[in-house]
């Protein structure tokens, strides 16, 4: 992932120095690396995703493209709508598999087949979703503590613990894997 970030920076610097400009660079990057986001109310968003049986090069490529998409969308949306996206699930790009990417503890990581093992407390989460740009932020009651079993792209089983906004982010993305959107909460 660090290699991808360095590659992105090198391309950006080359584009700026070459006179192409940042707009040209971002447009080229979007065409080559950014996945299309499924538009609400596409029925695919309501399907329950199936687990990934094995983590192969195709899954790793998908996760990398999802991370590229998240990195592209985050600053664009921040400047357009004052929103900062921190997570993306495979169903949001039209793939009904249990894969999410999100920024946790300053690191963007891929999480395969997440399963919530424990929830505690409540947390008032201010939520927004790139699938629903016409909807406003909502305050959603989420868990203040979450323990999740999952796999990484190296196929090893992991256990993640998250509190506060990180727990809310994980819960939001796992909801997408189960066909649930934040607008479903009252």
Please provide the spans of the model-predicted regions:
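Positively charged
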Residues: 2-186
């Amino acid at each position: 992932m660090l290699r991808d970030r360095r590659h992105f920076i090198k391309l950006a610097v080359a584009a700026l120095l070459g006179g192409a400009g940042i707009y040209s660079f971002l447009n080229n990057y979007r065409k080559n690396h950014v996945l299309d986001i499924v538009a609400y109310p596409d029925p695919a968003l309501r399907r329950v995703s199936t687990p990934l049986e094995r983590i192969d090069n195709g899954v790793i490529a998908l996760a990398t493209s999802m991370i590229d998409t998240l990195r592209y969308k985050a600053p664009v949306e921040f400047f357009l709508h004052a929103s900062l996206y921190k997570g993306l699930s495979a169903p949001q790009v039209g793939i009904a598999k249990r894969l999410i990417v999100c920024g946790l503890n300053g690191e963007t990581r891929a999480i395969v087949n997440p399963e919530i093992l424990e929830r505690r407390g409540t947390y008032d989460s201010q939520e927004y979703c790139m699938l629903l740009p016409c909807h406003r932020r909502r305050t959603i009651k989420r868990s203040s503590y979450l323990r999740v079993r999952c796999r990484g792209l190296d196929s090893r089983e992991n256990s993640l613990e998250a509190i506060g906004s990180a727990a809310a982010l994980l819960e939001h993305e796992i909801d997408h894997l189960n066909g649930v959107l934040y607008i479903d909460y009252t």
